[in-house]
Amino acid sequence: MKLLMLIVALMIIGVQSKDGYPMDHKGCKISCVINNKYCETECVTVLKGKKGYCYFWKLACYCEGLPNWAKVWDRATNKCRA
């Protein structure tokens, strides 16, 4: 029974969070070079996510565990006018 409750709890947590690149006011990814502290602040403090770091190869912040209301960058709906 405890295992079943654990599985249900994990499924609920997974449904209520998302991962992705947070966007600035222009609809662009938040850029970074190697500054994990900045990305951690943006993702955790501002957007109420669980974790944030600078994804080096993309030169952009990446957030994990964001609430569903947080806007994340999507290639299909990209409106970035950098």
UniProtKB/Swiss-Prot annotation:
SMART domains: Knot1. Residues 18-81 form the LCN-type CS-alpha/beta domain. GO terms for cellular component: extracellular region. GO terms for biological process: defense response. Expressed by the venom gland. Gene3D superfamilies: Knottin, scorpion toxin-like. CDD domains: neurotoxins_LC_scorpion (cd23106). PROSITE patterns: LCN_CSAB. Disulfide bonds join 28-80, 32-54, 39-61, 43-63. Its main location: secreted. Belongs to the long (4 C-C) scorpion toxin superfamily. Sodium channel inhibitor family. Beta subfamily. Has the structural arrangement of an alpha-helix connected to antiparallel beta-sheets by disulfide bonds (CS-alpha/beta). Beta toxins bind voltage-independently at site-4 of sodium channels (Nav) and shift the voltage of activation toward more negative potentials thereby affecting sodium channel activation and promoting spontaneous and repetitive firing. This toxin compete with high affinity with 125I-Css4 bound on rat brain synaptosome and may bind with high affinity to Nav1.1/SCN1A, Nav1.2/SCN2A and Nav1.6/SCN8A. This is Beta-neurotoxin Css9. The lineage of its organism: Eukaryota, Metazoa, Ecdysozoa, Arthropoda, Chelicerata.
